[in-house]
Amino acid sequence: MRIEDVRTVPGLSGFFFDDQQAIKDGATQTGFAYDGQPVTDGFDRIREAGEALIVEIELADGSIATGDCAAVQYSGAGGRDPLFRAEKYRPVVEGAVADALRGQDATQFGANATMLEEMSPQRSGGDQLHTAVRYGVSQALLNAAAQARGVTPTDVLADTYDTEPATSPVPVFGQSGDERRINAEKMLIKGVPVLPHGLFNSVEKVGENGEGLRDYLAWLSDRATALGPEPYSPRFHVDVYGILGKVFGPPYDRTEVTDYFETLREAAAPYPLQVEGPMDAGGRQAQITEMAELREGLADAGVDVDIVADEWCNTFEDVQAFVDAEAADLVQIKTPDLGGIQRSAEAVLYCDGTDTRAYVGGTCNETVTSARACAHVALATDAAQVLAKPGMGFDEGFMVVTNEMRRALARRDATQEVPADD
């Protein structure tokens, strides 16, 4: 089945683009917007409406495969590609990318995705095409291969990487945003496997001595017991955005720090706990050093809390560096930051055989189409967990990702059933 054409149309993403540096520099939030001037290149305001570029690949039989070019909320920060503007990159996809893909065999996802990954970067100003372009077009290529072959995208990825896909839904990870109590209770009622994120992104929220986070975990444990279905064994996952580093500071293997993590474990009990982004060391190598120091300190003290890499773990090479250094129990695979969707699968698989698990993450600023593609990455690689996305409302993203996995598993089960002899 040949690719006939590639078309695009500008669309919307599930959240907003935020100028992270301006916010860190003290921009004042007024209602939902921020006062002040942006400081990151490409921004006209500190908070702007999210954009996506909808990609359609037309196959020889007239069928259409779709993907969405999307970028993270904090675009342009931390060495990421520039702020993604759909209209700016539309000619890139409909021009050089489309020219390269027309006539290609749609069933050959691996070859097509590799060609896209290696395309000339002249319009993006970096070493490759903009990550959002590679992300969206590769989703369409994945769907095109699945349609041409009459299988699920999970099967395409499993065949490409010779994996045994998960046979049940990968645990979905819900994020609460600032509505950390109301949304957590929603998650508990629905039996979400991993929750609640919590958005602990300031000392005010965490507490000057960390008491705010500890009290929240104790509340969450009580509510999980009261509201969760039977049986229910969730895993607690909170993101502290480096704030514990501000509260305690290095070295992170000292008794004061490990004792505090033990109080977090006790507050969360009987549910297991993982803490994302405990500190922000300002650079990848420094972050790896401090994360490893904390992880070793917790192990030596017998504190059973998992540490999750987030800050300075954006690209495939970053994931490799954290895993090789044994600096985390779990790494987030930030799908839009890796470019082609196949790179996310490769990043998860890099963790196989190591002491580090991987979760298929991403951003609230994605789309339904990209979230569904990531659900197949999680299934094909049997990831530790997968983010509920897009948006910050929780319910919608949880529905999208959960239903996509259930559909894929049901279809795979049906096609693998052997009919009985007459």
Curated annotation (Swiss-Prot):
GO biological process, one term: glutamate catabolic process via L-citramalate
Pfam families, per database record: MAAL_C, MAAL_N
Record carries keyword Transmembrane: no
Binding site for (2S,3S)-3-methyl-L-aspartate: Q175, Q332, T363, C364
Involved pathway(s): Amino-acid degradation; L-glutamate degradation via mesaconate pathway; acetate and pyruvate from L-glutamate: step 2/4
Assigned keywords, A-Z: Lyase, Magnesium, Metal-binding
Site (Transition state stabilizer) residue list: H197
Signal peptide: none
Residues annotated for Mg(2+) binding in this entry: D239, E276, D310
Catalyzed reaction equations: (2S,3S)-3-methyl-L-aspartate = mesaconate + NH4(+)
Family under the similarity heading: Belongs to the methylaspartate ammonia-lyase family.
Subunit and partners: Homodimer.
Main function: Involved in the methylaspartate cycle. Catalyzes the formation of the alpha,beta-unsaturated bond by the reversible anti elimination of ammonia from L-threo-beta-methylaspartate (L-threo-(2S,3S)-3-methylaspartate) to give mesaconate.
Protein name according to UniProt: Methylaspartate ammonia-lyase
Organism (species): Haloarcula marismortui (strain ATCC 43049 / DSM 3752 / JCM 8966 / VKM B-1809)
